[in-house]
From Swiss-Prot:
Catalytic activity: urea + 2 H2O + H(+) = hydrogencarbonate + 2 NH4(+)
Gene Ontology biological process terms, A to Z: urea catabolic process
Gene: ureA
Keywords on record: Cytoplasm, Hydrolase
Localization annotation: Cytoplasm
EC id: 3.5.1.5
Stored InterPro entries: Urease_gamma (IPR012010), Urease_gamma/gamma-beta_su (IPR002026), Urease_gamma_sf (IPR036463), Urease_subunit (IPR050069)
Pathway(s): Nitrogen metabolism; urea degradation; CO(2) and NH(3) from urea (urease route): step 1/1
Protein name: Urease subunit gamma
Family that this chain belongs to: Belongs to the urease gamma subunit family.
Length: 100
C-alpha cells in the first residue's frame, strides 16, 4: 500500500485518537497527545460527514472536559488547528480553548 505523507499523518492521528477513546472509555484521564488527537480526529470525521467549519469549531469544544484530562493539560492546549478536507477543498479549522 502506497500512502502519501499526508495520508500517513491522518492514519497516525486516527490511531492515537482510537487509543485515547479507549482510555477515556475506561475512565482514564487523557494526556496532552491523546487529547489533541481525539479533538483533531473528531474535527476530521465531522468534515468527512459534511459539517461546516463553524459547526466543527463548536464541536471541537465539546469533545473533552477538564475532568477528562490530566491536571494542566487544558492549559497546554490554547487552540487546536486541523486542515480538514471538505467537499469544496481543504480548510483550516481552529478551535480556541478546546478543553472546557
Amino acid at each position: 500500500m502506497e500512502l502519501t505523507p499526508r495520508e500517513k499523518d491522518k492514519l497516525l492521528l486516527f490511531t492515537a485518537a482510537l487509543l485515547a477513546e479507549r482510555r477515556k472509555a475506561r475512565g482514564l484521564k487523557l494526556n496532552y497527545p491523546e487529547a489533541v488527537a481525539l479533538i483533531s480526529a473528531a474535527i476530521l470525521e465531522g468534515a468527512r460527514d459534511g459539517r461546516s467549519v463553524a459547526e466543527l469549531m463548536s464541536l471541537g469544544g465539546e469533545v473533552l472536559t477538564r475532568d477528562e484530562v490530566m491536571d494542566g493539560v487544558a492549559e497546554m492546549i490554547p487552540e487546536v488547528q486541523v486542515e480538514a478536507t471538505f467537499p469544496d477543498g481543504v480548510k483550516l479549522v481552529t478551535v480556541h480553548e478546546p478543553v472546557r
